[in-house]
Amino acid sequence: MTILISGSGIAGLTLGLTCHQLGFPFKIFESVEKIKPMGVGINIQPNAVRELFDLGFEYDLENIGIKTKEFGTFTKKGLKIWTEPRGKLAGYNWPQYSVHRGQLQMMLYNRLVNLAGKSCVCTGWKVRDFKDINSGISVEVVSENKKEKKFETGSVLIGADGIHSRVRKIIYPKEGKPIWNGAVLWRGTSESKPFRTGASMVMIGHASQRVVAYPITQTNKVSGKAIINWITELKFDPSKGWRKEDWSRKVNSSEFLPKFKDWKFDWIDIPELINNSEDIFEYPMVDRDPVKKWKKGKSLLIGDAAHPTYPVGS
């Protein structure tokens, strides 16, 4: 019987590809009408790269990202504290990659629909409710655009629908909203000359004010520049709350840039990186308390729906 999946983010698409590889029938429901590349940079650690290689993405990852060579921490004056190698250079059997999240998502989506057909991802439909039945699970899905609803039957329902998971909310109806820890992150990408090894990830500053930066593309041989992903972080009083737990809220740099105006070093210029960005996204650093189980009956959770975190180094 069919495996039903809620959400076509990184977890949902990877799960769909795994189902196809193993010969299990599946169907993904995605609330948006059209899947578009969203987000900024992320790091894919060697244990995750191993799974993507197994799905046949070894050459694709090389085309959309860059192998991370080094991680380093630095003071707010730009002085080195610690550096260490990453990926194969650190002894792993697989590399670490830095990529644009949107490029990663579209890589997964395009491969999936090429292998299994476009009908395997039902866009414009989202899970509203579900219940276990003798033959598996019955899932109610709705289309707000079409003003329709229908029922799908499968062997299991897997919630891959993120930190605001509808599946998780039904399993744990009293859980409430995600918890904010007082940190706010601003993220963006800009074209700039890469620093240090040319494939280094750096963390600059301290716990209440810091910057993370790393390239997410190969260096252009003509311009000598790469796309650099950057993250700035400031701490606030968590008791006062924040506007919204939303990583895609566009903002102006004036909300945080003054705090980093002097962070100009001989190897990286943080204000320049920020000012050269076309779009800047703001989101609070939120997660949820652990739950005892990621499964109830024939429904279960994966990804941020199961264990949501927003690590500043991602």
Residue ranges and their predicted role:
Residues 5-32, 158-159, 186, 255-256, ...:
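Conserved mid-domain beta->alpha element of the FAD-binding
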Residues 2-3, 45-172, 176-189, 240-242, ...:
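Conserved N-terminal helical subregion
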